[in-house]
């Protein structure tokens, strides 16, 4: 296998990181909706914590995307 093929295999593996971020964000907001349904008085605090968690999970996906782009164009 040449280096170009290995590079694209590596980029394909980096897609797993973006998949993990998407699953993490969906899990966060699913839990948020369940929590708000159980305790509507805690909505403001739960939303704040969910947005922080979603931002951190999404940052991992963006880091994975940046590394994939670096692999493609290097």
Swiss-Prot record:
Compartments in which it is found: Cell inner membrane
TM annotation in the entry: 8-28, 52-72
Main location: membrane
Protein topology in the membrane: Multi-pass membrane protein
CDD domains, A to Z: ATP-synt_Fo_c_ATP5G3 (cd18182)
Lineage: superkingdom: Bacteria
Any one cellular-component term (Gene Ontology): plasma membrane
Keyword Aminoacyl-tRNA synthetase included in the entry's annotation: no
InterPro entries named in the record: ATP_synth_F0_csu, ATP_synth_F0_csu_DDCD_BS, ATP_synth_F0_csu_sf, ATPase_proteolipid_c-like_dom, F/V-ATP_Csub_sf
Keyword Ion transport: yes
A Pfam family it matches: ATP-synt_C
Keywords of this entry: ATP synthesis, Cell inner membrane, Cell membrane, CF(0), Hydrogen ion transport, Ion transport, Lipid-binding, Membrane, Transmembrane, Transmembrane helix, Transport
One term of GO molecular function: lipid binding
Positions marked as site (Reversibly protonated during proton transport): 58
Annotated family: Belongs to the ATPase C chain family.
UniProt xrefs under NCBIfam families: PRK07558.1 (NF005733)
Summary of subunit composition and partner proteins: F-type ATPases have 2 components, F(1) - the catalytic core - and F(0) - the membrane proton channel. F(1) has five subunits: alpha(3), beta(3), gamma(1), delta(1), epsilon(1). F(0) has three main subunits: a(1), b(2) and c(10-14). The alpha and beta chains form an alternating ring which encloses part of the gamma chain. F(1) is attached to F(0) by a central stalk formed by the gamma and epsilon chains, while a peripheral stalk is formed by the delta and b chains.
Function: F(1)F(0) ATP synthase produces ATP from ADP in the presence of a proton or sodium gradient. F-type ATPases consist of two structural domains, F(1) containing the extramembraneous catalytic core and F(0) containing the membrane proton channel, linked together by a central stalk and a peripheral stalk. During catalysis, ATP synthesis in the catalytic domain of F(1) is coupled via a rotary mechanism of the central stalk subunits to proton translocation.
Protein name (database record): ATP synthase subunit c
Organism: Rickettsia bellii (strain OSU 85-389)
Gene name for this UniProt entry: atpE
